[in-house]
């Protein structure tokens, strides 16, 4: 199984794109996959932001797929890719015993490999995995893409509701007070669960990705 997704970010103040299999953030590392295998390929056509042009990506996507299939036969799993500063960097994890099989030969491009003992999957958790803000961006993007598929005019403001759940009434009230200061309305709801403290906030906003993500991050 896999749960691949991507998000844009910056690394060392330079534009970057990260493609990561979020499946492992739920189930944890496979047994014995204690070693981080890194393959870096120098892109020939960097593009405007150093993340590669579509034609460059087409070549390296094909090679990436080929490499993943080859390494999977030796218990090495592909977990993510970073594109930034003209480098196409792929990360794999597997047992240390698989090191002899980790060889990279991209078409007409310079490459380097590194192998690190990383039983805690620190690189996966701290670098590849999205922050809370980026996770919210990914969820917001999915919603916007669904609206686009329905031909929604995203830039037209409309009432948008946001739900939040709390363990105490005090936590809910503090949240509502802060949100109302930013122009949100507390849509009162009756809950059948006396221990359930729910806030339903609304505000008129466009629902293009930039606008809706900005609204969500006010409420997070």
Residues covered by each model-derived region:
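Long, contiguous binding/interaction regions
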Residues: 1-220
């Amino acid at each position: 199984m896999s749960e691949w997704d991507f998000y844009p970010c910056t690394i060392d103040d330079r534009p970057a794109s990260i493609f990561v299999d979020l499946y492992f953030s739920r189930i944890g590392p496979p047994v014995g996959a204690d070693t981080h295998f890194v393959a870096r390929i120098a892109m020939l056509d960097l593009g405007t932001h150093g993340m590669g042009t579509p034609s460059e990506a087409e070549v390296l996507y094909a090679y990436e797929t080929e490499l993943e299939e080859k390494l999977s036969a030796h218990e090495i799993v592909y977990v993510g890719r970073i594109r930034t500063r003209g480098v196409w960097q792929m990360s794999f994890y597997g047992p240390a015993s698989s090191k002899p099989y980790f060889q990279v030969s991209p078409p007409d491009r310079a490459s380097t490999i590194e192998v690190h003992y990383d039983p805690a999957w620190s690189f996966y958790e701290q670098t590849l995995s999205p922050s809370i803000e980026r996770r919210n961006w990914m969820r917001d993007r999915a919603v916007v893409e669904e609206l686009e598929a329905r031909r929604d005019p995203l830039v037209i403001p409309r009432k948008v509701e946001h739900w939040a759940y709390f363990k105490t009434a005090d936590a809910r009230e503090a949240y509502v007070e802060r949100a109302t200061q930013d122009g949100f309305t507390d849509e009162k709801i009756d809950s059948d669960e006396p221990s359930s403290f729910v806030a339903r906030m609304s505000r008129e906003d466009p629902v293009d990705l930039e606008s809706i993500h900005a609204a969500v991050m006010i409420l997070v």
